[in-house]
Every structure is written in C-alpha cells, then in structure tokens.
Amino acid sequence: MPGRSALAVGAIALALVSGGIGGAVGAWSVRDSSGPVVNSLDAPKPDTQSVAAAPEGSVQAVADKVVPSVVRIEVAGRTGAGEGSGVVLSSDGLILTNNHVVAGGGQGAQLTVFFSDGSTAPATVVGADAVSDIAVIRTEGRTDLTPIELGSSENLAVGQEVVAVGSPLGLQSTVTAGIVSALNRPVSTSGDNANQASVIDAIQTDAAINPGNSGGALVDMKGRLVGINTAIATAGGQSGSIGLGFAIPVEQARRVAQELVDTGKATHAIIGVQVPSRDDAYGARVVEVVPDGPADRAGIPDNAIIVRIDDRVVTDGDSLIAAIRSRAPGDTVKITYKTPDGNETTVDVVTASDSAGR
C-alpha cells in the first residue's frame, strides 16, 4: 500500500537522524571524561501531585471538557461500511453527526457508537437530511452521557482559535488545534444521487481534519460547539489534511437537528430562483424565477444578477445557495441585484420552505 510505504520510509529516516545524533553525543562523552557523569535515569521521578491544572482557554482544558462528548461511529451495511464521528446532544443518547456518515452503509445499516471511556452501544437513525448533510442518531440503553455545550457561530471571527475533536482514520478522541481561516465559505458536497448537491455555508479552518473526522466537533476555546466538521479539500491524490477543513455552523446544524428530532425531516429556505453554480457573471445569474415564489413576489426578474444577501457578497450560484440555506424558512433577507442594463436594486424577500410543495 503506497500510504504505508511512505510512512515506513519516514519512520526509517527519522530513526537514522536520531541515531546520528545519539552517536555524536556518545562519542563526545567518551572523549571528554574529565567531568562528572550525569545520567537522567538516576534522577528522581517528578512529583506528579504538583502538576498544575490546565489553564482555562488552553487546548488541554478544551480537550478535557470536550472529549467525553465526542464519539466514534462505525457503520456496516449491505452497500458498504465506514466510520465517522459524532457529538453527544443529550444524556439519554441523542448524537449529532453528518448524513454522509450514516448513509454510507445504505438502508438498514448497523450503527455502533464508541465512547471515550471505551464502552460501546448500538444506535438507530432518528432522522437524516442530505441537503444540509446533518443526521441525528440515538444510542440504546444509555442515560449517563455528557452532552456537549452548544456555542454560537454567529460571533466567530477570522483568526479566532478553535479545536477539532474526532476520530480520524479510526483514531478515537484525536484533538487538533488551529484557527478560523474564513467564514461563509460555500462548499459543495455530494448528495444522495448525482442530481443533488449539498452546498453548505461553511466555516473554514486549518485545524487538521482527516477522513473519519466527519460529524465531529469544532469548538471554541471555552469548549463550546461552533461547527460540525464535514469536509476537507485535497490536492491531487492526497486524501489527508492540507490545512483546508470545513465545518457546518452550529446554528444551522442545531436548527436542522431539532427538526429531525421533532419530525424526522428537515426544511430548507428557498427564494424561488434557478441559478447555475458558476458562470461568467460576478454574482448569481437568475436563469428562471419560479412564478409566485418569494423572488417573483419581490419583483426580481429573469436575468437579474444577485450580488448581495444582506451584507454578504454573492459571487456565484453556490454562494447564493449557501447564504439562503443558512437561514430558516420565513426569514426576511435583503437581496441586492443588478438588471442587464446595470441598474442596482435592493428588495426584501421572505424565504419560503422547500417542503411547501411536498
């Protein structure tokens, strides 16, 4: 396996370097024998009772708080097997994760949850939503779990420190740290079939995220959940972290999770326009306005180019979809668009639910 070969070469190179350093030190010790010999093995063991508690706001303190609330999930089904991560929502077994984690095994797949204390429990799907890539599962027979503290992603700032906790490559309770690299990053991931795309309004982070981190926690330095780790960018044939990870903001994840718990289904905000993911226009070109939809009622015409949602710049269709889906049905947004003759207009649009026509 190429991955293992590369790892083995790295380990050998590291051992050789260490061996070279050890040889040089040993030769110096033999030549210079005039001074006293000091041996670390003879030193007394440190007083473990005097070790200071992790300072508040440190990665260690965050890990101590968050690790018990993050789980590993194994999925086994007729169409495949996989694994991911999840975060505990309730003491009686509700767990938040990604849809693509639980969907990997197909319908009827068996889910097993592994907790940080080494215990396991079977789980069933409460509800899953491919559009938002959010799912909620419930473990059986547990009433003593530690729910994660929910924070807010609305006040996040670029450069703010964050910590990711999950099970990359099955390595449970892995903790990595980084910063918020960008906000409101539209990221397109695969849906349930080739005709459906899930565009998330993502938090971008350089905290190391790898396969298996999906569904895990992105938290602030107080250990509060700010995002659900979902996707990574890769370069060429690489499949590991290159410092470009993406998380679903907790506000969106929380709203969808609550709907899944309450009804088993999720709703998504729409404005009733068709736009290409990308084209030559700087903005989202409206190729079709749905009759009597929110955009139509607000007066947005065909061929308009939407350039802003509230105070957010819209650069293409994906960024428009991400911005709208980050809102709840019934929210009012200010949409700024340009007409083909160059005139710019701002209108209020009340979003509708995509479930209205079901």
Indicate where each model-derived feature is located.
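C-terminal recognition in membrane/secretory proteostasis and scaffolding
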Residues: 1-36, 255-358
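N-terminal activation segment of mature serine protease catalytic domains
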Residues: 21-85, 134, 258, 357
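Interdomain regulatory linker/hinge segments that flank or connect interaction modules
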Residues: 30, 43-50, 228-271, 352-355
